[in-house]
Amino acid sequence: MQVCWFERFGGGNQLLTVLSSSRTCYARFVNFKVFKRMENYRLRRNMPRTGPCKLLLPLSCGISSSVLLHILNAQIQHELAKSHPSPGFDLHLLVIEPSSISHSSLSYDEGFELLQQTFPLHSFTRIPLHSIFELDPELQEVISQFSKDGFVDDTGLSAKERLDAFRASIPTSTSKVDVDYILITRLVVAFAKKIACRGVLWGDTDTRLAAKTLANVAKGRGSSLTWQVCDGMSPFGVEFNFPLRDLFKAEVDNYASFFPELTRIIIPDEPPSENVLTKNLSIDELMMRYVQTQGEKYPGVMANVTRTASKLQASLMPANVPQCSFCGAFMLNSGNNDGGDTTGASRALELCYACIRSRPELTC
């Protein structure tokens, strides 16, 4: 008797049992999860049904975002094969050069060429992280004030050297991860606006969203959950959506193992080191480890974290509510913000509570 995807082991890990005879069935199951989440864009609900509906998919070249690209590509191909296809959407892929984010990462030249050959229906752009100065000029003023005495922005240096110096001025592992996430988000949003995208499709699974929920609350970013883990409008004026939110990381890993073309373009995740002291890990890394280990034992509990967070709704904001100069979050209690600086003609730097905590002089 053969076992299909919906039959599970009786053991403690609760991983899905997938035999070769049921791979088609399993792939259909995963595709349908994403298909439901993309229905509004596919049918153009509450949006113009004529003209292009361009969506941006930031591709980290990890398993999750690569699987999302593979699934969406298959859905678009299926739609185009119909005699009367639905209005649908156009997909643009953005790859932020991995070696510009982490010095331990290799250049993605060969992988990028392979991406374009594997998915010829879509347009691709590859940019380094330091191109944020060109796409988001306001950031230059923000970083010059953000670190205060810990960093001096030397405009005579190259964009890469300036950004490397700013990132090096952030002392703790938690603050480094937090600042890098904000920089990447700002770069993605700026690029999405440049090419007139309606929304951004993030490749976060249920596992990743649960870890992000716990980490953001711990870092003081609980108010940003309404757009960092929920589908809908972000404070940047661009929609954020998470089509993989109904899938666990283990399910995405299983899907990726079925398709050789994916294994050739995916940059494998570095296995977590068992010898790293807990104090040297960021809050984000700690929460991800916690969710992955506990998710194997109690998948329903971890799934409830994301489902509960997804029910949060942003309050109606008055038109004059300021936004954090760095992360973009709305600041309803800005009157208590002590992070503002005004130097000469420079405009005041307004920071939310979480960004103030990430400043070098306030970290310990």
From Swiss-Prot:
Coiled coil: none annotated. Gene3D superfamilies: HUPs. One of its GO terms (cellular component) is cytosol. It is found in: Cytoplasm. GO terms for biological process: protein urmylation; tRNA thio-modification; tRNA wobble position uridine thiolation; tRNA wobble uridine modification. Pathway: tRNA modification; 5-methoxycarbonylmethyl-2-thiouridine-tRNA biosynthesis. One of its GO terms (molecular function) is nucleotidyltransferase activity. Its main location: cytoplasm. The keyword Methyltransferase does not apply. Keywords: Cytoplasm, tRNA processing. Plays a central role in 2-thiolation of mcm(5)S(2)U at tRNA wobble positions of tRNA(Lys), tRNA(Glu) and tRNA(Gln). May act by forming a heterodimer with ncs6 that ligates sulfur from thiocarboxylated urm1 onto the uridine of tRNAs at wobble position. Prior mcm(5) tRNA modification by the elongator complex is required for 2-thiolation. May also be involved in protein urmylation. Belongs to the CTU2/NCS2 family. This is Cytoplasmic tRNA 2-thiolation protein 2. It comes from Aspergillus fumigatus (strain ATCC MYA-4609 / CBS 101355 / FGSC A1100 / Af293). The gene is ncs2.
